Structures are given as structure tokens and as C-alpha cells.
């Protein structure tokens, strides 16, 4: 892992922590946020624990966040969080990797809202819109 990869991973981690801090505060308005949960795919594990996690069912590419609450014809919400990185002229938005696209496509076919977001603010907007307004799983 390069230094820039490590920085990007730590940024994504801090953004995800901020989403859960917001969710805890927003539970008065949206009690369903009690069930917002995360996969541990983004966690860097020592090799022994990584092997154990894989044996226990961790799957590469699985989205970072899951809210198992049906809304607007969807069975639930999945979110893949990506960091915003700085390019030469404007922020670059990382793309989904092959395994992440495969999960996204599968989940959409199965009736879930599955979106990619860049940073905590976008994740919070997606969750708020999903719980209150709607979700367009085919735009991201």
C-alpha cells in the first residue's frame, strides 16, 4: 500500500465514522437509523484475521453501509463510500472497482437501492432522502 493509498483509506474511514456519529444524533428524527450498519471490507486486517474474515463470509466488493429498511419500493439501502481526492484542477471522484460494480448491479436487480457516495455529506444526504423522500438507484 502506498502512502497516498493509506491517506485515502484513513480519510474514507473518518468520513464513515462521521456518518455513524450523525446517525446517532439523527435517531430522534429517523429511529430506523438504529439499524444502519457497516461491512468491515475497508478495514486493513493482519493476514491471519483477513483469512479468518474471508472464511467467516466477508466478500470482496460488498458495499460499506447497509440500512435494512424498506422504502419507496426498495428492500433496503446500500452505500459504497468513496473519498474525494484532489486532482490538479478539481476533485477526482474514485470509481467503483469491478467487484463493487458487480455487487451494486446484483443488489439493484434484487430490489435494493444501491448508491456510491463521495464523503460523509453525500452519504448523509442519500440516507436522509431515502428515509424521507426517495432513491434513484440508477443514477450513480
Residue ranges of predicted features:
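Catalytic phosphate/metal-binding cores of nucleic-acid and nucleotide-processing enzymes, i.e., regions
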Residues: 1-140
